[in-house]
Structures are given as C-alpha cells and as structure tokens.
Amino acid sequence: MATYKVKLSGEGVDKTIDCPDDQYILDAAEEQGIDLPYSCRAGACSTCAGKVAAGSVDQSDQSFLDDSQIGDGFVLTCVAYPTSDCTILTHQEEGLY
C-alpha cells in the first residue's frame, strides 16, 4: 500500500495531507480535521467536486461526471483515490455548470 501527499487548496483550505491509495480523499481529509463539502458520499452528485491541478486519481466509483468533465480535470473527492502525489482545487462545484 502506497501513501501519497495530497495538497488541498481552495476557499480557506490550503493543506497537504497523507492519503493511502486505498482511502478516499474526502475521508482522509476529514480524519485530518479538514472540512470539505460533501452530500451523497457515493459519487452520485457534485457537492464534493474538485479539480485535479497536478497528479492523478482513480475515481472509477463515481457515476456523476461525464467524460468531458473528467477530461477537464474534475474529480469527486468522496470517491477518489490518489494514484500519485497530487494537488486538488477544492470547492469546484460551480465550475461544473
């Protein structure tokens, strides 16, 4: 099991957390005291949307984002595992629409 550095940045958040490759980014952030937006926790809405600014994630459990949005770097943090050190811009729901 690998652990990656995930930098979270946006709306008063600017922290780097350690996130194992088998833990969702939202869950790891909460465990480390970071309050990020969420609603369904199942990858079926856009409340937790972020944008990958660097690095990569596996969000194959999500069912909301279309291929174009994923191609633009959007990520649902509630169902995203890091696959490298990465930077996520948080609070990006409005950017989806």
UniProtKB/Swiss-Prot annotation:
CDD domains: fer2 (cd00207). Its cofactor is [2Fe-2S] cluster. Gene3D superfamilies: 3.10.20.30. The keyword Cell cycle does not apply. Residues 4-94 form the 2Fe-2S ferredoxin-type domain. It holds the Pfam family Fer2. [2Fe-2S] cluster binds at C40, C45, C48, C78. Keywords: 2Fe-2S, Chloroplast, Electron transport, Iron, Iron-sulfur, Metal-binding, Plastid, Transport. One of its GO terms (cellular component) is chloroplast. GO terms for molecular function: 2 iron, 2 sulfur cluster binding; electron transfer activity; metal ion binding. Its main location: plastid. Binds 1 [2Fe-2S] cluster. The keyword Oxidoreductase does not apply. GO terms for biological process: electron transport chain. InterPro entries: 2Fe-2S_ferredoxin-like_sf (IPR036010), 2Fe-2S_ferredoxin-type (IPR001041), 2Fe2S_fd_BS (IPR006058), Beta-grasp_dom_sf (IPR012675), Fd_pln (IPR010241). It is found in: Plastid, Chloroplast. Forms a complex with heterodimeric ferredoxin-thioredoxin reductase (FTR) and thioredoxin. Ferredoxins are iron-sulfur proteins that transfer electrons in a wide variety of metabolic reactions. Belongs to the 2Fe2S plant-type ferredoxin family. This is Ferredoxin. It comes from Guillardia theta.
